[in-house]
Structure formats: structure tokens, C-alpha cells
Amino acid sequence: MEEFKGYLEKGGFKQQHFLYPLLFQEYIYALAYDQGLNVNASTFNEPVEISGYDKKYSSLLVKRLIKRLYQQNSLIHSVNNAKQNRFVGHNKNFYYQMISEGFSIVVEIPFSLRLISSLKEKKEIPKYQNLRSIHSIFSFLEDKFAHLNYISDILIPYPVHLEKLIQILQCWIQDVPTLHLLRLFFHDYHNWSNDITITTNKSTYGFSKDNARLYRFLYNSYVVECESIFVFLRKSSSYLQSTSFGPLLERTHFYGKMKDIGIISCNDFQKPLGLFKDPFMHYVRYQGKSIIASRGTHLLLKKWKSYFLNLWQCHFHFWSQPSRIHINQFAHFSFYFLGYLSSVEMNPSSMKSQMLENSFLIDTVTPKFQTLIAIIPMIGSLARAKFCNLSGNPISKPVWTDLSDSEIIDRFGRLCRNISHYYSGSSKKQSLYRIKYILRLSCARTLARKHKTTVRTFLQRLGSEFFEEFFMEEEKVLSLMLARTSYPLHQLYREPIWYLDIIRINDLVNHL
């Protein structure tokens, strides 16, 4: 990174003005690909050694690719054939994938340097541990959402027009050749001439798979543009102006989170004061779904809904259905988020109070944030993975019957432990037990099918030790965590336990 910084700061010019020359540096592609170039030399109609180092991307090869992209641009548009997929004997997809990887590395450099410089401004860079965990979101929800009144469930809209993405990047990157190459790249890739949809559907599956890094960067740029208003509103919600406010940027590996305590200063005070910034709304997002919760009234949420609709229609130039934003009262609503069905449960309780000779009962209601497993979508995921049918009845896994018995048991056991690990924060464990039952019986059916016998006969032959693979690891972890407590293990196992080492959602619940 220091090498990039020195290159970008040559001549005292701004960093974002000199991104295009970096596309011709070989070490850019060495960063993009840790492994060598696993492509036959015949792809280039020339030996790889002539292009540069053996099994490496070279600046000479990159120059030729970009030159051919520009030269063939008019030919491609004149032919206008959607099935045409090659540049005069060269694989078109490979050209685009190679350029996109280099572009992704280069375009992230200004943002990486900006983030590093913002961290270096502080005297001490705090070591945030486990803050990148997905489960850290639920800790925030438990602390904040239980005391709020209304919640708005939002699906971030799509599609985003191609030129709008270019305009968003143009605000941050002033290197015209880089933006021009990106525009050319989009217009040519699979003959895209209308829209790029920021979603995981069939039309963009190929693009998001072949150009995952560029796809994530563009998606984050679009989301940051949508969320930029929150920085202004959070500043405005404070009575005194903050001396500093961190940028609202999302990164794959972020270094910290916004704090609720802001240090402020004012001429009327001799010392800096700590102002608790308790805004009128709380905002949480994961992928394409976001949650806004407020302590205010229903009218306030309706104003927010109107604002978002106007923002998407006027700024991003596309129509967004009002039905994509739902406003509900927290006490009567459950929302899906990160594979959990979350809600606020009101727990009534009575307390006896005595004053002098009179005693009376005081009825109180305590809100508690509940997180349940969304069992129906989870069973649907298991059914698509061929572990059960749509009714939740376990079935065998035919594609694994060629594996050894130990490998089959290990795969089922590892999957069961991962799901138990992720859903350990569930308030009620009945759904988790059902999922483990499906996986255990599916494992038994798979082994019985492999050995051409019945499940009953197979289980009688193996005995009770067969299912230890599905229990022992989790029980050991829990016993180590809760060894110092005086409560029995089975009682504490019913309580939510958030593991802060989970950085991605389980593959089986990616659709939520």
C-alpha cells in the first residue's frame, strides 16, 4: 500500500487523478490473483513467456487487451449480435474478467488510503475484535430495539442505471480514462445496454460470479450513496455540532463501528462535553435489506417512507414501489433478518409494594427482544440442498453415496455443528432440534442407501455412538463457556448465546 501511495502522490497531485496508469502495472494483477495464470497459452495465440513472466500477468498483455477492447468496440456494436462472444479468436469473457479484476484493485486504492489516513489521525488505533461478526448486530438490536415503537422494513430497490453508477463513482474518482474504460466495459459485457441490476437474480448471476470483486465494489458504492443522507441527519439530530464524524462507508473487512458517544465542543463551555447522541431513528442493513426503527410516532415513519421514495425516484431515476417499505408497530410485528425471525415480546410481571400499613400490587411490562429460527425458509433451504422434502421429511443424499462412511458422517456433522453454531442465539431451541433431527436422519438414510439396507437395521448395527458426532463438539464448547456459572447446563442452553466469530451468514439461509 505504501508503494501505491508513493506512486499516486508523485508531483503532489491528488490521488484519484492517476488511477489509469496503474492498470498497466503487473503487480496490480499479482494482487488480484494470488495464484498464477491458469490459462493455456493458445488463448493469446502466442506463448506466455513472450507476454512477460511465466504464469504471470504482464503489462504488455494488459496493454494489448485494452487496445483490442477499444479497437473492437465499433465492430461489436455494428454487428449487434447477442450471441457473439469472441474477439477474433480470443475469448471475450476472459478479456473482461481480467480487466475487471485489475480495475477493482486500482479503484479501491483511493478508498483504502482514505481509510488508513483517517485511522492514522487518531493517536491510538483501537483493536476492534469481533466487531466484524454478524452476530454483533444482534447485540445492538437487543440493546436498542426493545425500547422502540415502530419499525420500517425496507428492501433496497433495483435496478440502477448504468450511467448512474458512473456518476456515483465520478464524485469520488476524477480520472477520466478510468471512468471511460469502466463505461466501455459495462456496455460491452454481455451486450448490456440498459441496466445493471444490483441483486442476485439470473440476469446478473454471471456478472457477479465472474467479477465478484467489482460487483461488490459497485454495490457498496450504490448503497453508500443511498445511505449518505444518514450522516447529515445524524449530525442534525444533535443539539450541538460534533467536532468530527466518521464516514459512513461499508467495507468487506471494516475496522470499527460508529459510537453512540460523540465528543463535542462549544465556546460556552470550557471543557469538551460528552453528548449522548440518541437519534430519532436506528438503522441496520445487511446486503439488500435494511431496517429503520424509531421511538417516534407513525407519522414520523410515514415521512421517512415518503423521503425514500422521492430519493429513489428523483436521484436514482427509477420508480420504486411503495410496497417495498413496510411500517409496523414493534409490539405486533416480526421481521426476517440474517436468518432469524425477530420481534419484541412483552413479558408481564407483578411486584408487591408496601407503604406503611398499605400494600398493593404493581403490574409492569418488560420488553424482551426475541430471535427465533425462521423454520419454514430453513426447511426450504434444506429441501433445495436435497436433505429433506418440502414437508421437512428427511431423505437421503444420493450424490454423497460414493464417499466413504467417515467422510459422509463428517460432512453431515460439520454442517450440523455450523448451523447450531450460527443459530445458538435463538430464544427457543425447538426449531434447532428439528433441523438437527433432519440432518441426523438424512445422514442415516444416506449411509443405509449406500450399504443397500434399511435405516432401522443400519442404526441397530452402529448403536447410539453414531450420533455423537452431532452433539459432542457443541456440548464441549458450551460446557467450557459456562463452567464458572452455578446454573445447570441444560437451563443455560435455552438462553441466546451469540458467537462473535461468525463473519458470514450460513449458505443455507442466504436467500433471507
Curated annotation (Swiss-Prot):
Source organism, top-level taxon: Eukaryota
Keywords, alphabetical: Chloroplast, mRNA processing, Plastid, RNA-binding, tRNA processing
Xref: Pfam families: Intron_maturas2, MatK_N
Keyword Ribonucleoprotein carried by entry: no
GO biological process, one term: tRNA processing
Any single Gene Ontology cellular-component annotation: chloroplast
GO molecular-function terms, A-Z: RNA binding
InterPro entries membership: Domain_X, Maturase_MatK, Maturase_MatK_N
Coiled coil ranges: none
Compartments (UniProt record): Plastid, Chloroplast
Record has Transmembrane as a keyword: no
PANTHER family, alphabetized: MATURASE K
Purpose of the protein: Usually encoded in the trnK tRNA gene intron. Probably assists in splicing its own and other chloroplast group II introns.
Family note: Belongs to the intron maturase 2 family. MatK subfamily.
Protein name per its UniProtKB record: Maturase K
Organism of this sequence: Wolffiella gladiata (Florida mud-midget)
Gene: matK
